[in-house]
Amino acid sequence: MISIYKSVDFNNPSKIERLENIEPGCWINVTAPTKQELTLIQKKTNVPMDFLNAAMDDEETSRLEIEDTNILIIVDIPFTEMEDNSLSYDTYPLAIVHTEKEIITICLKNSKVLTDFINGKVKTFFSFKRSRFILQILYKVATYYLLYLRQIDKKSVMVEKHLHKSLKNKELIQLLSLEKSLVYFSTSLKSNEI
Protein backbone atom coordinates (compact mmCIF):
# COMPACT_ATOMS: atom_id res chain seq x y z
CA MET A 1 0.00 0.00 0.00
CA ILE A 2 1.31 3.42 -0.94
CA SER A 3 0.45 6.49 1.15
CA ILE A 4 1.80 9.94 0.33
CA TYR A 5 1.99 12.67 2.98
CA LYS A 6 3.20 16.25 3.11
CA SER A 7 3.56 18.87 5.82
CA VAL A 8 1.26 21.76 4.95
CA ASP A 9 0.99 23.92 8.06
CA PHE A 10 4.28 25.50 9.13
CA ASN A 11 2.67 26.72 12.38
CA ASN A 12 1.59 23.18 13.24
CA PRO A 13 4.58 21.00 12.28
CA SER A 14 3.07 17.66 13.23
CA LYS A 15 0.04 18.19 10.96
CA ILE A 16 0.38 16.39 7.64
CA GLU A 17 -1.95 16.06 4.68
CA ARG A 18 -2.49 12.96 2.60
CA LEU A 19 -1.81 13.47 -1.11
CA GLU A 20 -2.89 11.64 -4.24
CA ASN A 21 0.31 12.35 -6.20
CA ILE A 22 4.00 12.60 -5.43
CA GLU A 23 5.17 16.19 -4.89
CA PRO A 24 8.53 17.69 -3.90
CA GLY A 25 8.94 17.59 -0.11
CA CYS A 26 6.55 14.70 0.39
CA TRP A 27 6.92 11.46 2.32
CA ILE A 28 6.02 8.26 0.47
CA ASN A 29 5.18 5.55 3.00
CA VAL A 30 4.98 2.07 1.48
CA THR A 31 3.69 -0.90 3.47
CA ALA A 32 3.78 -4.50 2.19
CA PRO A 33 4.06 -3.34 -1.43
CA THR A 34 3.32 -5.34 -4.54
CA LYS A 35 5.81 -5.47 -7.41
CA GLN A 36 3.50 -3.14 -9.37
CA GLU A 37 3.54 -0.56 -6.57
CA LEU A 38 7.34 -0.65 -6.37
CA THR A 39 7.59 -0.30 -10.15
CA LEU A 40 5.25 2.71 -10.02
CA ILE A 41 7.37 4.39 -7.34
CA GLN A 42 10.54 3.62 -9.28
CA LYS A 43 9.12 5.27 -12.42
CA LYS A 44 7.95 8.38 -10.55
CA THR A 45 11.06 8.89 -8.38
CA ASN A 46 13.90 7.31 -10.41
CA VAL A 47 15.12 5.45 -7.32
CA PRO A 48 17.04 2.25 -8.16
CA MET A 49 14.78 -0.79 -7.93
CA ASP A 50 17.23 -2.63 -5.64
CA PHE A 51 16.82 0.22 -3.12
CA LEU A 52 13.05 -0.24 -3.22
CA ASN A 53 13.28 -4.04 -2.94
CA ALA A 54 15.75 -3.94 -0.05
CA ALA A 55 13.16 -4.15 2.75
CA MET A 56 11.20 -6.96 1.09
CA ASP A 57 13.49 -9.60 2.61
CA ASP A 58 12.65 -9.94 6.30
CA GLU A 59 16.22 -11.14 6.92
CA GLU A 60 17.82 -8.07 5.27
CA THR A 61 20.75 -6.68 7.24
CA SER A 62 21.09 -3.07 8.30
CA ARG A 63 23.23 -0.98 6.02
CA LEU A 64 23.77 2.32 4.25
CA GLU A 65 24.15 2.67 0.47
CA ILE A 66 24.58 5.70 -1.76
CA GLU A 67 23.88 5.73 -5.48
CA ASP A 68 23.90 9.03 -7.38
CA THR A 69 21.69 11.38 -5.32
CA ASN A 70 19.81 8.58 -3.53
CA ILE A 71 20.70 7.34 -0.07
CA LEU A 72 19.37 4.02 1.24
CA ILE A 73 19.29 3.36 4.98
CA ILE A 74 18.09 -0.01 6.23
CA VAL A 75 17.49 -0.54 9.94
CA ASP A 76 15.74 -3.31 11.82
CA ILE A 77 12.75 -2.00 13.74
CA PRO A 78 10.87 -3.71 16.58
CA PHE A 79 7.34 -5.09 16.28
CA THR A 80 4.88 -6.80 18.58
CA GLU A 81 2.49 -9.55 17.50
CA MET A 82 -0.11 -11.66 19.25
CA GLU A 83 0.94 -15.30 19.12
CA ASP A 84 -0.91 -18.03 21.05
CA ASN A 85 -2.62 -15.47 23.32
CA SER A 86 0.76 -14.00 24.18
CA LEU A 87 2.55 -10.91 22.96
CA SER A 88 5.68 -11.78 21.01
CA TYR A 89 8.41 -9.45 19.85
CA ASP A 90 10.19 -9.49 16.51
CA THR A 91 12.07 -7.22 14.14
CA TYR A 92 11.67 -6.37 10.47
CA PRO A 93 13.75 -4.21 8.16
CA LEU A 94 12.70 -0.65 7.38
CA ALA A 95 14.14 0.93 4.25
CA ILE A 96 14.46 4.71 4.24
CA VAL A 97 15.34 6.25 0.89
CA HIS A 98 16.48 9.88 0.88
CA THR A 99 16.10 11.37 -2.60
CA GLU A 100 16.61 14.89 -3.89
CA LYS A 101 12.91 15.70 -3.51
CA GLU A 102 11.27 13.21 -1.15
CA ILE A 103 11.64 10.58 1.56
CA ILE A 104 10.46 7.04 0.89
CA THR A 105 9.90 4.51 3.70
CA ILE A 106 9.28 0.85 2.90
CA CYS A 107 8.38 -1.89 5.36
CA LEU A 108 6.78 -5.33 5.19
CA LYS A 109 4.36 -4.46 8.01
CA ASN A 110 2.56 -1.46 9.37
CA SER A 111 4.89 0.08 11.94
CA LYS A 112 4.08 1.98 15.13
CA VAL A 113 7.25 3.98 14.49
CA LEU A 114 5.82 5.45 11.28
CA THR A 115 2.22 5.53 12.52
CA ASP A 116 3.34 8.00 15.20
CA PHE A 117 4.35 10.44 12.44
CA ILE A 118 1.08 9.93 10.56
CA ASN A 119 -0.99 10.49 13.72
CA GLY A 120 0.87 13.69 14.64
CA LYS A 121 2.56 12.25 17.75
CA VAL A 122 5.99 13.50 16.69
CA LYS A 123 6.45 17.20 17.34
CA THR A 124 8.42 19.39 14.94
CA PHE A 125 8.04 16.91 12.09
CA PHE A 126 8.22 18.34 8.58
CA SER A 127 8.15 16.00 5.57
CA PHE A 128 10.37 18.33 3.55
CA LYS A 129 13.16 18.37 6.19
CA ARG A 130 14.39 15.01 5.00
CA SER A 131 17.61 14.61 7.02
CA ARG A 132 15.84 15.68 10.20
CA PHE A 133 13.00 13.27 9.43
CA ILE A 134 15.48 10.38 9.16
CA LEU A 135 16.97 11.28 12.55
CA GLN A 136 13.48 11.45 14.04
CA ILE A 137 12.66 8.00 12.63
CA LEU A 138 15.87 6.56 14.10
CA TYR A 139 15.08 8.17 17.46
CA LYS A 140 11.58 6.63 17.39
CA VAL A 141 13.08 3.22 16.56
CA ALA A 142 15.41 3.48 19.58
CA THR A 143 12.48 4.59 21.77
CA TYR A 144 10.39 1.56 20.79
CA TYR A 145 13.32 -0.81 21.35
CA LEU A 146 13.70 0.57 24.88
CA LEU A 147 9.95 0.33 25.53
CA TYR A 148 9.76 -3.27 24.34
CA LEU A 149 12.92 -4.26 26.22
CA ARG A 150 11.36 -2.92 29.44
CA GLN A 151 8.18 -4.91 28.70
CA ILE A 152 10.22 -8.07 28.04
CA ASP A 153 12.14 -7.55 31.28
CA LYS A 154 8.92 -7.18 33.29
CA LYS A 155 7.41 -10.28 31.69
CA SER A 156 10.60 -12.28 32.29
CA VAL A 157 10.56 -11.38 35.98
CA MET A 158 6.87 -12.37 36.24
CA VAL A 159 7.40 -15.67 34.42
CA GLU A 160 10.45 -16.47 36.56
CA LYS A 161 8.40 -15.89 39.73
CA HIS A 162 5.68 -18.22 38.43
CA LEU A 163 8.34 -20.72 37.43
CA HIS A 164 9.77 -20.81 40.94
CA LYS A 165 6.30 -21.60 42.29
CA SER A 166 5.40 -24.26 39.75
CA LEU A 167 7.50 -26.15 37.30
CA LYS A 168 5.05 -26.29 34.42
CA ASN A 169 5.74 -26.40 30.74
CA LYS A 170 3.62 -23.30 30.12
CA GLU A 171 5.97 -21.02 32.07
CA LEU A 172 9.04 -22.59 30.46
CA ILE A 173 7.57 -22.01 27.00
CA GLN A 174 6.79 -18.38 27.87
CA LEU A 175 10.31 -17.86 29.15
CA LEU A 176 11.79 -19.40 26.01
CA SER A 177 9.58 -17.15 23.87
CA LEU A 178 10.82 -14.07 25.71
CA GLU A 179 14.38 -15.32 25.37
CA LYS A 180 13.82 -15.69 21.61
CA SER A 181 12.55 -12.09 21.44
CA LEU A 182 15.67 -10.87 23.22
CA VAL A 183 17.85 -12.72 20.71
CA TYR A 184 15.98 -11.05 17.82
CA PHE A 185 16.38 -7.64 19.40
CA SER A 186 20.02 -8.19 20.29
CA THR A 187 20.88 -9.35 16.78
CA SER A 188 19.01 -6.44 15.20
CA LEU A 189 20.59 -3.87 17.50
CA LYS A 190 24.06 -5.26 16.73
CA SER A 191 23.21 -5.11 13.04
CA ASN A 192 21.93 -1.51 13.33
CA GLU A 193 25.23 -0.58 14.97
CA ILE A 194 27.16 -1.20 11.73
Where are these regions (language model features)?
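Peripheral, non-transmembrane regulatory/ligand-interaction domains of membrane transport proteins
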Residues: M1-I194
